[in-house]
């Protein structure tokens, strides 16, 4: 039994050592400063709410207020001239839309304020779109290795957070 425990410990340790960063320091610095990155959402963290907690606790191995989005296409694409957000929303809305296609945080903005502040080992990037219907603010906390958390503040909804990673945008193929 002890040898089995040691074997599992070694396997976990080797796996942890082989865990690779999403991007290296130079790439992360370059894409943040160039205002050209994609935030890929891996988990969603809605605000605590009794009704939502009751639903989430029904899932096996559920961790309160943490929704796994791995494998989804939820992201925020940032370039110098646009911000495109496609993210889900799982919290309380104070002014809901009657349009069923208008759920989540989905917008395209060409007029926005972008600020990136370098801290010791991370960046704080704030994006405020000016041409979207709801007044929103996106705050990214980005590590040197490309891991990021995103907090979305909206006047019509409870705040919501996401964890994920940054990547460089893939170049579109020209036909």
Q: What is the meaning of each model-derived region?
A:
Residues 1-28:
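Bacterial Sec-dependent N-terminal signal peptides
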Residues 23-32, 111-175:
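Helix-rich interaction surfaces within compact, conserved domain-sized segments
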Residues 24-86:
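N-terminal secretory signal peptides
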Residues 42-44, 79-81, 88-90, 130, ...:
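Solvent-exposed coil/turn segments that connect beta secondary-structure elements
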Residues 47-50, 90-94, 132:
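Short, cysteine-centered beta-strand-loop-beta hairpins and adjacent loop/turn segments enriched
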Residues 59-69, 101-108, 126-133:
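Short, solvent-exposed secondary-structure boundary motifs
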Residues 67-118:
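Mid-length scaffold segments of soluble, non-membrane domains
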């Amino acid at each position: 039994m002890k040898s089995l425990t040691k074997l599992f410990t070694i396997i976990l340790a080797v796996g942890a050592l082989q865990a690779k960063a999403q991007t290296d320091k130079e790439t992360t610095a370059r894409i943040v400063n160039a205002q050209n990155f994609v935030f890929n959402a891996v988990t969603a963290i809605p605000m605590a709410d009794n009704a939502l907690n009751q639903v989430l606790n029904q899932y096996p191995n559920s961790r309160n207020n943490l929704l796994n989005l791995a494998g989804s296409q939820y992201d925020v694409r940032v370039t110098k001239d646009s911000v495109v957000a496609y993210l889900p929303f799982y919290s309380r809305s104070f002014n809901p839309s009657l349009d069923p296609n208008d759920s989540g945080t989905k917008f395209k903005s060409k007029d926005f304020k972008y600020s990136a502040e370098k801290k010791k080992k991370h960046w704080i990037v704030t994006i405020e779109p000016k041409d979207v219907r709801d007044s929103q603010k996106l705050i990214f906390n980005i590590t040197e290795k490309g891991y990021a958390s995103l907090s979305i503040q909206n006047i019509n909804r409870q705040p919501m957070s996401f964890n994920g990673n940054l990547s460089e945008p893939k170049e579109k193929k020209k036909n």
